[in-house]
Amino acid sequence: MGSPRLGSLAGRFDPESQAAAYAAAGAAALSVVVEPDYFFGSYELLTACKAACGLPAIAKEFVVDLRQLDWAVAAGADAILLVAALYSRDELAGWARAARARGLAPLVETHDASDLELLEGEEWEMVGVNNRDLRTFEVDLAHSIAMRPRLPAQALAVAESGIATRADVDRLKSAGFDAFLVGESLLLCENPAVKLEELFG
């Protein structure tokens, strides 16, 4: 578990205990990186974390092979991340159909207006906006806020990355976001329960 920016976080905390702490503090779902090369995750990590907390689990992966969907199902995932920028419009719709056929809810991650164009012609359950530019790693919450009016009306709107304070959450709620994918500020804090209370209590 980790990121290209932070490197591996292995040994800094126990992922299963962390997942259990999230659940005890009221988290609605668990996002688990399963991509091994850049984010140091695994499907085994997802299985262990879900068993420890019982929350619905989102597998975070760069999906390019149908076997990845099958591995996610076998690991116990309930949803899968689809990074819109990796696909054409038809490819994205196809991956979403393949995920749904396996019982996985697709969370489509967008970052800019060109990604939103890929969503046209399909109904989406969940659409996220990543506040982090994966090319520069810079974070700007104003990015999500500007994108929010263009998200599909029926989709659960998820703000992703850069959420560190209650003021951030309130700002994004006011913009119309329904859910929040919080990563680093929880992973790097000393007490996840206290941090979740600070953000959402």
Predicted regions mapped to residue ranges:
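Active-site beta-loop-alpha junctions enriched in small/polar residues
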Residues: 1-2, 35, 62, 85, ...
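Glycine-rich phosphate-binding active-site loops on the catalytic face of alpha/beta enzymes
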Residues: 71-91, 128-137, 177-196
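Glycine- and Gly-Pro-enriched alpha-helical subdomains that act as flexible
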Residues: 34, 44-48, 52-68, 74, ...
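Catalytic cores of alpha/beta
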Residues: 64-76, 111-123, 159, 163-182, ...
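Active-site mouth loops of central-metabolism enzymes
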Residues: 1-15, 56-64, 107-109, 158-163
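Glycine-enriched alpha-helix->loop->beta-strand junction motifs that scaffold or abut catalytic
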Residues: 26-27, 52-55, 74-80, 100-104, ...
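C-terminal helical cap(s) of enzyme catalytic domains, especially alpha/beta-barrels
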Residues: 146-150, 173, 186-201
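Glycine/Thr-rich beta-alpha phosphate-binding loop at enzyme active sites
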Residues: 4-10, 18-38, 119-148
